[in-house]
Structure formats: structure tokens, C-alpha cells
Regions:
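Basic nucleic-acid-binding alpha-helical/helix-turn surface characteristic of O6-alkylguanine DNA
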Residues: 1-103, 145, 149-163, 174-186
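Short glycine/serine-rich loop segments
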Residues: 103-177
């Protein structure tokens, strides 16, 4: 479901919870600042299309300044400054906290990631546990060694490995794995 306020993306979720939360927030405002709130049920391909076309200014997000800063950094993982798509990459929570200039606040950054209202468009699924990053790098390094040269150890095949923990995701672990696979196979 895509929730929009005056045409701008406010949330993406699998149920009406995001719409209810936004409606409650808007109801608390003294004077209505927005004219139109809509919610549309869409399929995964539609959400992916929105993700590829949306720029940062196409969203209206409710959260603290810190949360918005974290969400912007997440958005920048898959988008250039001008909003055009760029090659995505997996990143650990600690490295992402450092990217947010908050190395000591990994938990605060992780919490803000978990509150991301526009999952998929703001790619919180690309942030995974450091142990998983280290494992993937280790396998890739082995693939470059003479012993494993010629073996089929592609990223696509590696991401299907059930032993890799990609971490929690508001929309479920299975969807997080599927999103990472789709993101990195493009």
C-alpha cells in the first residue's frame, strides 16, 4: 500500500497501519496543512517502479530530524544527488552509522532504520549485520584465490545461501532477502 499526501509518498506498507498512523498525526495538527491523503493498494512491481522513479523531494516523511537524516542517507545508497538510480550496495549497521556521522550511535541509527516509513523506496533492506558482510567478503576473496578460480560463486548464488543472516525487517525476513536479491541482481 502506498500512502500519499498531496501526491507525495508518505509511507509504503503491507497494511493500513501506516495510513492510520499518518491520519492520527495529521488529526493532531491545529490547522490542516495538507489537502489530500490517499492510500492505494499496489503490487510489488508497482512499488519497485516507484522506487526507481522517486526522488527525495517526491516524499513527505514524518519523523525527527535525526530519523530524516538517517532515511536520507539510506535513500542515497541507491540514488545519486540528482535522484537518478545508482548501483546499490550492502552495508553493515556499524558502517552505516559511521556514514551517518554517528559511529557511537549504532543502536540509534538502527532504530531509525527500523522506523523507515517508505520501505523499498528508502532501501533499509540493504543494511545488514556486520557478520554477514564479513562472510560475503570472505567468500568473494576465496573465489579470487587460485584454489577456487573458475568456481561459480556469483553474488546471486551467494545471496541465496540460507546460512546468511540479513537481519530483521519490518516487512519480514523473507521479503528482505528477496529485496536484496532483486536489488543486487540488477
Amino acid at each position: 500500500m502506498v500512502v500519499r499526501i498531496d501526491g507525495k509518498i508518505a509511507a509504503i506498507s503491507t497494511d493500513y497501519a501506516a495510513l492510520a498512523a499518518i491520519s492520527a498525526r495529521l488529526a493532531q495538527q491545529k490547522s490542516p496543512a495538507y489537502r489530500k491523503v490517499t492510500a492505494e493498494t499496489v503490487g510489488f512491481d508497482d512499488v519497485w517502479d516507484i522506487r526507481n522513479k522517486a526522488g527525495w523531494n517526491d516524499m513527505i516523511l514524518f519523523g525527527t530530524e535525526f530519523q530524516k537524516k538517517v532515511w536520507r542517507r539510506l535513500f542515497d545508497l541507491t540514488h545519486e544527488e540528482d535522484g537518478s538510480p545508482k548501483a546499490p550496495r550492502l552495508i553493515s549497521y556499524s558502517d552505516f552509522a559511521d556514514l551517518c556521522q554517528n559511529k557511537a550511535g549504532v543502536r540509534a541509527v538502527a532504530h531509525a532504520i527500523g522506523l523507515n516509513p517508505a520501505a523499498v523506496v528508502i532501501p533499509c533492506h540493504l543494511v545488514i549485520p556486520k557478520e554477514s558482510i564479513d562472510y560475503i567478503k570472505g567468500v568473494q576473496e576465496k573465489a579470487q584465490s587460485t584454489i577456487f578460480k573458475g568456481d561459480d560463486i556469483s553474488m546471486e548464488k551467494l545471496l541465496q545461501e540460507k546460512g546468511i543472516d540479513f537481519g530483521e525487517y519490518a516487512l519480514g525476513r523473507r521479503l528482505k532477502r528477496a529485496l536484496i536479491q532483486k536489488e543486487l541482481s540488477q
